[in-house]
Amino acid sequence: MAKDKKFVEDITPMDEDFAQWYTDIVKKAELADYSSIKGCMIIRPNGYAIWENIQKYVDTKLKEYGHENVSMPIFIPENLLQKEKDHVEGFAPEVAWVTHGGDDELAERLCVRPTSETLFCEHYAKIVQSYKDLPKLYNQWCSVVRWEKTTRPFLRTTEFLWQEGHTIHETKEEAESHSLKILNMYSRLCEDMLAMPVVMGKKTEKEKFAGADDTYTIESLMHDGKALQAGTSHYLGQNFSKAFAIQFSDRNGKLEYPHYTTWAVTTRLIGAIIMVHGDDSGLKLPPRIAPTQAVIIPVAQHKEGVLEKAKELKERLAKVVRVKLDDSDKMPGWKYSEYEMKGIPLRIEIGPKDIEKNQAVLVRRDNREKTIVSLDEIEVKVQEMLDIIHNSMLEEARKSRDEKTYVAITMEEFEDIIENKPGFIKAMWCGDRACEDKIREVTGATSRCMPFEQEVVSDTCVCCGKKAKNLVYWGRAY
């Protein structure tokens, strides 16, 4: 029992060592474990179930929009990868290569996919002839490999899970509209399911996806004041279509190149959930994404009728929420700590006195508030409570982000904020790449996005003092 107690309690305080706190939660909440391969992880059932719920939401939305799922090969021939110059240069440092099949050296190296634009383009070139074939709306769920130098579970790993959408369209307007439609869906995923507020915007030329005309992004802020790119949607223009000779006959019989979009979210969203919502007691899962939304803990379960009532309660609640009954022989106090550490949104306690009064006690994970409810209306009350918890977690995360969002007019202010008050910095920018590079060199901060909701906090660039063009969110990032 002492060992079990230590397992539950031994989490490094986040203010003492945020990185170790994060690692402790990943391991102790049984989300993932380290693999023997550097930079790779084993996603355990608790972690994978969160990803499955993300998948379910995204897949349902994509199918509502008319997308179809496909599966592309994991290998890309070297000649295919090199067809789009900017694209291959952007990924070259991260590519893993297969050079042998068994004992035989391959005639051509095969890249282990870092992303699949080249494969989709090769396929689209074969199947598209007319405007009547458009749009093509494909998506795949898979893993990709990027040989990262610095890794951390979920946030940056050599291999990770994602969905990648690849669509081609008749017109630029249709493709751009589709890119933004997907970005809006990602934003709703984060806010409506993960209780995580995001800033929507456009990446600068320096930060956009290799080979894209425009990259749109949703940016989130972690508890330690670092930014995290939660999802991206790219308008690739006709760059890839031309490189791969994808052409169609338009409505006038003229050959044209389709307009391409690609977009993705990954398992790094699980890392974001940990770092936005977690506390020193462990994980704190938003109810709508939590694999288990409520756990029933019988108190004095050895007493007559308690376990039977708890089982009856589980049967009732299982019709409306994802619920678990813990009837193990561990002490209730140990169970409270364990499920708090694992982030279960709602704990339901029921003991002999509760049964006498026809009631149960609901305990929220987010603020530990207790509420007594009648067993006659517990299905409704539990669902209402889960919605309250979601809204409260979203509001708390938004408040934390807003409190850590600052305005800088000069470089002196910028440097002072970045060193002493980690968070987002809103500052004006002239649009010159040299200023963007200098800000990163001096402060370690990168441009996160030019938000769609622009405002003017100054007339001049924070770096050079020249006339400003855009408001930019800046920050140090994962």
From Swiss-Prot:
SUPFAM superfamilies: C-terminal domain of ProRS, Class II aaRS ABD-related, Class II aaRS and biotin synthetases
Top-level taxon in the UniProt lineage: Bacteria
Keyword Lipid biosynthesis: no
Xref: Pfam families: HGTP_anticodon, ProRS-C_1, tRNA-synt_2b
Catalytic activity: tRNA(Pro) + L-proline + ATP = L-prolyl-tRNA(Pro) + AMP + diphosphate
InterPro entries: aa-tRNA-synt_IIb, aa-tRNA-synth_II, aa-tRNA-synth_II/BPL/LPL, Anticodon-bd, Anticodon-bd_dom_sf, Pro-tRNA-ligase_IIa, Pro-tRNA-ligase_IIa_arc-type, Pro-tRNA_ligase_II_C
Entry EC no(s): 6.1.1.15
Cellular compartments annotated: Cytoplasm
UniProt GO molecular function: ATP binding; catalytic activity, acting on a protein; proline-tRNA ligase activity; transferase activity
Enzyme category, top tier: ligase
GO cellular component: aminoacyl-tRNA synthetase multienzyme complex; cytoplasm
Keywords from the named record: Aminoacyl-tRNA synthetase, ATP-binding, Cytoplasm, Ligase, Nucleotide-binding, Protein biosynthesis
Primary location recorded for the protein, binned into one broad class: cytoplasm
Biological processes, Gene Ontology terms: prolyl-tRNA aminoacylation
Keyword Aminoacyl-tRNA synthetase: yes
Record note on quaternary structure: Homodimer.
General function of this protein: Catalyzes the attachment of proline to tRNA(Pro) in a two-step reaction: proline is first activated by ATP to form Pro-AMP and then transferred to the acceptor end of tRNA(Pro).
Family: Belongs to the class-II aminoacyl-tRNA synthetase family. ProS type 3 subfamily.
Record text about domains: Consists of three domains: the N-terminal catalytic domain, the anticodon-binding domain and the C-terminal extension.
Protein name per the record: Proline--tRNA ligase
Provenance organism: Clostridium botulinum (strain 657 / Type Ba4)
